[in-house]
Amino acid sequence: MKSKIFIACDTTSVSKVKKIIKNTQTSKLKVGYKFGLEFLNSKNGRKFVSKLNNQITFGDFKFSDIPNTCASAVKAIKDLKFNYCTIHISSGLEALKAAKKVSGKTKIIGVSILTSLDNKALKEIGY
């Protein structure tokens, strides 16, 4: 079995993402592509993602809200057929369950702490 790696497509530019995908295709690894809200909401971002039928895709959206809203957010991207999608676990177990219930084949990944937060920042917000 091939190892998997995800490449972050942290841009709003479709042309940059096309280059990233072109330059990272390899037979040695299963390569997937991570997209955040900035790309999904960019001009033509959603349209581009909808055409990535043969790619492994990861929607790193960190949805964080009440259960009904998290579920609705997951439903709203269901047509894009992401393999993975993130929900912030601070939304609570019921929100995670609600998202999972409507996710179909998309696997839900719980995000606990943002990587940009160091110990000082975590203490400032009460962790």
Where on the chain are the PLM-derived regions?
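Conserved alpha/beta-domain cores
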Residues: C9-K47, P67-C70
